[in-house]
């Protein structure tokens, strides 16, 4: 069979089908005669017995044909006499039922005997089973070789008359491919019979005159009929041995018999022996193509050629917008996206776009770790994987081998994603456990919604943020649960170095019940920001080493749940056995508290630099990290309670920190503030602090926070009413050091070292007293009968609206100042013992948020009951605009 160079020279039909032995003169398949004549003109020295094929053609896959072609249609067996007929005398179209004899030794002559609309797909398999022993062996070998490299085109060209009516081999290729993809059913044999014979006669009529006659005679003499029949007999079993391929084309294509070449090492199947040989090189380690300039070897020649360009510094592909050049065209196209800004690759999880596939794949590894189960593992093998398959194909070059590689890559990516889906599931459970900590919450049920369906929704919407706890269920309680931002001080570490989400509950072992109070606005999970997490984490690291527990002042807050005041942990708990609960009613805030997660897009670099700067400074700040040089505390209290407790003998040896340390901390706080404001797009000026005002008792200044707000609630009862008269900032972050009041028996910073807990000398208290005397007395008490004569007499106080707390708590916290005197250092823990929490949980303290003209928010707490003693609120406010003094006469302002 001659695959004429007419294919190479652009002839209409290149291969001869049934009449291949005639040299194309009587080519029954596809107008090969004319093209063969052109081949003779183009290559006069090319031997007639050899097959010319194009080595540049891609490696060809052989396709199986449906079993409907098992029986050779008689129309395809073209006789040699018809093929050898003189070109000037084209044979008349034979009768449809006439059986032609096949050319004897042409390896491709057997193909037309089985050729149907799917016949060319069988070409390679049939060739493998033919082993001619005559002089035609060389020629059939050429056919064999040709079908390895160009079988797709040759087979299509051979059968082009059946599809294209003799209009050319390329047309046949197109139709074959369309049939291959559309799985068109086989056309009736009679129809093919007519088409084949009529097209062959037409092609002979057109092009037969151009082919020399003697070639056909020579070929005819070389092909005896018996051998031809033997070959046909040999091929029948192969054709009939594939009845399993009956059915639609898809089943035939996917059939394993389509890949008859099996690897002995790994049992991989391949369509051709060429592919198998190339594959075996991987097992043997043989690299037949060695680089002449280095020791690298390659299993394919094109890889070597591409590698040699590195040595020759040849970069044929240049960017038209800059001077960069590239070895591969794909690299140039990928580079051009940097100029155009095109980002064609999209992450299905977080909807980010990327210009390069490697960046997308790298992102998917990190994105998959943060995304929760609801976003990725719900359908681990669906859209993400199909998209990745397409993505991998897009990212590679145009060669078929690279596409095969990308198939395996995409499969590997799918496996990885399935694994990450599983790991995400385990990480979610870890998230839940870590953020629940050791909370004993018998009252929290599915309605509480810690681990409810709302979590999945939150996680789908906030993929890059840490796991937010919240519930989107609408329950009876319209409350916000503001979380303590530093739960890790208790001793647990949260995931990825961050504290828990904004609704994580910081509870202690003694806490028996904490009602998860929910907000109807469904925005609980978004009060936090990454900036807060960084602050919390950095402060957590300071206190964790010396964290201790004080079970003497644990409080059961179960009775707080029944009240209408909202349990809000707006501050940081540095207690082990107390639950930080501050009370704010959220019914007036639901409409105003905005979700903050979309504003918390602080880059990881900023957070890392914050932590790095903090860790660098922490060594030099161990002595007193939060001392303030010039504390200014204005106490607005009523006249009855204007006296400040001076009985507590603070250690006079503790001095304020040096100016350099204060300036260093001031610089750090400004740096954090700038980063925070930049990250939140200046949407609010309030940083983390509430300016809390407790009215009816003396206040104790603790100079622990430089450039920060200092909040010490007086030993009053901090039950909070439901009157919230102004708007919270649009997104209120968690304070790094929060207000600890209301439910706390007392604040002790036991996590601080003794050097950390030393207070400033008594002159600071004198400043407090002076500032208190200069302020107006307040008449804004809800209970007029509350009078504090001194802190030692607070056990005798009466409250008209409060519920009495168990007397043992009161007794345990009376007159402990005497125990503090012998101490060389003053600890806040002792302060808690001295002025323990004698509060009435039923009382209400209305919280008022006043926004001045500068957009700064002042928070005023009106205490209605005066039975709470010794409770301190400390809150570190990073945002400097919040340091304006409250102008109301009923408040205690802290700057």
From Swiss-Prot:
Comp. bias intervals (Basic and acidic residues): 130-140, 202-218
UniProt GO MF annotations: DNA-binding transcription factor activity; DNA-binding transcription factor activity, RNA polymerase II-specific; DNA-binding transcription repressor activity, RNA polymerase II-specific; RNA polymerase II cis-regulatory region sequence-specific DNA binding; sequence-specific DNA binding; sequence-specific double-stranded DNA binding; transcription cis-regulatory region binding; zinc ion binding
Gly residues bias spans: 7-36
Keyword DNA-binding applies: yes
ZnF region ranges: C2H2-type: 261-283, 289-311, 317-339, 345-367
Outcome when changing residue 527 to T: In a breast cancer sample; somatic mutation
InterPro entries from the UniProt entry: Krueppel_C2H2_ZnFinger (IPR050826), Znf_C2H2_sf (IPR036236), Znf_C2H2_type (IPR013087)
Residues the record lists as Phosphoserine modifications: 395, 484, 651, 785, 807
UniProt modified residues of type Phosphothreonine: 888
GO biological process terms, semicolon-separated: embryonic body morphogenesis; negative regulation of DNA-templated transcription; negative regulation of gene expression; negative regulation of transcription by RNA polymerase II; positive regulation of DNA-templated transcription; regulation of DNA-templated transcription; stem cell differentiation
Protein family according to the UniProt entry: Belongs to the krueppel C2H2-type zinc-finger protein family.
Protein name, UniProt field: Zinc finger protein 281
Organism of provenance: Homo sapiens
């Amino acid at each position: 069979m001659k695959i004429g160079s007419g294919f190479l020279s652009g002839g209409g039909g290149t291969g001869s089908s049934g009449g291949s032995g005639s040299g194309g003169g009587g080519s029954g398949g596809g107008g090969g005669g004319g093209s063969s004549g052109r081949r003779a003109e183009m290559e006069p020295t090319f031997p007639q017995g050899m097959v010319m094929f194009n080595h540049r053609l891609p490696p060809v896959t052989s396709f199986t044909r449906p079993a409907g072609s098992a029986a050779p249609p008689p129309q395809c067996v073209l006789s040699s006499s018809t093929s050898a007929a003189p070109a000037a005398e084209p044979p008349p179209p034979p009768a449809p039922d006439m059986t032609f004899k096949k050319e004897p030794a042409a390896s491709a002559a057997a193909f037309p005997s089985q050729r149907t609309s799917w016949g060319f797909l069988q070409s390679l398999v049939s060739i493998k089973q033919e082993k001619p022993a005559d002089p035609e062996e060389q020629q059939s070998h050429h056919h064999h070789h040709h079908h390895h490299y160009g079988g797709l085109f040759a087979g299509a060209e051979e059968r082009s008359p059946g599809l294209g009516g003799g209009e050319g081999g390329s047309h046949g290729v197109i139709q074959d491919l369309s049939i291959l993809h559309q799985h068109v059913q086989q056309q009736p044999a009679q129809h093919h019979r007519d088409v084949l014979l009529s097209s062959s006669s037409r092609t002979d009529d057109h092009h037969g005159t151009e082919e020399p006659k003697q070639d056909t005679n020579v070929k005819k003499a070389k092909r005896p009929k018996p051998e031809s029949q033997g070959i046909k007999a040999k091929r029948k079993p192969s054709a009939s041995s594939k009845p399993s391929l009956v059915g639609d084309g898809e089943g035939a294509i996917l059939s394993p018999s389509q890949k008859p070449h099996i690897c002995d090492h790994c049992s991989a199947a391949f369509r051709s022996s060429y592919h198998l040989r190339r594959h075996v090189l991987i097992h043997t380690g043989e690299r037949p193509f060695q680089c002449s300039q280095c020791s690298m070897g390659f299993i394919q020649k094109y890889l070597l050629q591409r590698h040699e360009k590195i040595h020759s510094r040849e970069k044929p592909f240049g960017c038209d917008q800059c001077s960069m050049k590239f070895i591969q065209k794909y690299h140039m196209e990928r580079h051009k996206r940097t100029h155009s800004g095109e980002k064609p690759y999209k992450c299905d999880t977080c909807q980010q776009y990327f210009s390069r596939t490697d960046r997308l794949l790298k992102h998917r590894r990190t994105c998959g770790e943060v995304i929760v189960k609801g976003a990725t593992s719900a359908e681990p093998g669906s859209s993400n994987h199909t998209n990745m398959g397409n993505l991998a194909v897009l990212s590679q070059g145009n060669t078929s081998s690279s596409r095969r590689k990308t198939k395996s890559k995409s499969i590997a990516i799918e496996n990885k994603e399935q694994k990450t889906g599983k790991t995400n599931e385990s990480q979610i459970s870890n998230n839940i456990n870590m953020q629940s900590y050791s909370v004993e919450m018998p009252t929290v049920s599915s309605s509480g919604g810690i681990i409810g369906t709302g979590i999945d929704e939150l996680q789908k919407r906030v993929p890059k943020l840490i796991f937010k706890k919240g519930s989107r269920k609408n329950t009876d309680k319209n409350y916000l649960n503001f979380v303590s931002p530093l739960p890790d001080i208790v001793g647990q570490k949260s995931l990825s170095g961050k504290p828990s989400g904004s609704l994580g509950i910081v509870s202690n072992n003694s806490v028996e019940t904490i009602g998860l109070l929910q907000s109807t606005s469904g925005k609980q999970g978004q009060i936090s920001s990454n900036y807060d997490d960084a602050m919390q984490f950095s402060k957590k690291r300071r206190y964790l080493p010396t964290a201790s527990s004080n079970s003497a002042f644990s409080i059961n807050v179960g009775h707080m749940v029944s009240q209408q005041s909202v349990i809000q942990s707006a501050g940081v708990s540095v207690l082990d056995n107390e639950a930080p609960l501050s009370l704010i009613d959220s019914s007036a805030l639901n409409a105003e508290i905005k979700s903050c997660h979309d504003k918390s897009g602080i880059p990881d670099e900023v957070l890392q630099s914050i932590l790095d700067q903090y860790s660098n400074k922490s060594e030099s700040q161990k002595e007193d990290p939060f001392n303030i040089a010039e504390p200014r505390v204005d106490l607005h209290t009523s006249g009855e309670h204007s006296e400040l407790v001076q009985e507590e003998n603070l250690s006079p040896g503790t001095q304020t920190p040096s100016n350099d340390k204060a300036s260093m901390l001031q610089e750090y706080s400004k740096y954090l503030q700038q980063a925070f404001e930049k990250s939140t797009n200046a949407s609010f000026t309030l940083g983390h602090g509430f300016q809390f005002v407790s009215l009816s008792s003396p206040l104790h200044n603790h100079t622990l926070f430089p450039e920060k707000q200092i909040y010490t609630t007086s030993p009053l009862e901090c039950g909070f009413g439901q009157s919230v008269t102004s708007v919270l900032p649009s997104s209120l972050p968690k304070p790094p050091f929060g207000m600890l009041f209301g439910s706390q028996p007392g604040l002790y910073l036991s996590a601080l070292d003794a050097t950390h807990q030393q207070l400033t000398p008594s002159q600071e208290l004198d400043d407090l007293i002076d500032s208190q005397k200069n302020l107006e007395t307040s008449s804004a008490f809800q209970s007029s009968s509350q009078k504090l004569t001194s802190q030692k007499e607070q056990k005798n106080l009466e409250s008209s609206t409060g519920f009495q707390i168990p007397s043992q708590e009161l007794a345990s916290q009376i007159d402990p100042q005497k125990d503090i005197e012998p101490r060389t250092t003053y600890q806040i823990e002792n302060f808690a013992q001295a002025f323990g929490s004698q509060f009435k949980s039923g009382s209400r303290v209305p919280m008022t948020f006043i926004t001045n003209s500068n957009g700064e928010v002042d928070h005023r707490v009106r205490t209605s009951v005066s039975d709470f003693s010794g409770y301190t609120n400390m809150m570190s406010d990073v945002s400097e605009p919040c340091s304006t003094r409250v102008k109301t006469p009923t408040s205690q302002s802290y700057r």
